[in-house]
Amino acid sequence: MGAVARAIKSLEPQLGWSRRTSGSHGSPRYIEDHVHGMICGPGGAESRYDIQLGFSLMAPHTRYPDHHHPPEEAYVLLTPGEFRQQGGEWFDPGIDGGIHNEPHHVHAMRSGKTPFLAIWSLLT
């Protein structure tokens, strides 16, 4: 994990940073306790609109709100974390595990006792 953290740190000045500020069922401090880094996509190190590649970082015990969007999306977990799709049960795909979200499907993610870090991609 140290190598991944160093790689992200080296890209930090070029990344587009953002936070989600709306959504239902997020933990009380989720706005302060999460950030997205855009590597490739609008505002990222490489600005393009056909694909987005970035990562999500959340503090321990943070629940990201239920949300949905038109593009399909894939995540690969670099740390422990859980996902929920379409109001179903929470599940942990495991470190190096992945998840795919269909277009417009409601989904959410949450961290446990450790920080959450995942790489994601949206096909726009």
Give the ranges of each region predicted by the language model.
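A short, N-terminal "cap"/entry segment at the start of jelly-roll beta-barrel domains
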Residues: 1-49
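Conserved short histidine dyad/triad with adjacent acidic residue
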Residues: 35-42, 51-69, 103-104
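Residues in well-ordered beta-strands of folded domains
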Residues: 38-40, 54-56, 75, 84, ...
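Ligand-binding loop in jelly-roll beta-barrel domains
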Residues: 70, 104-124
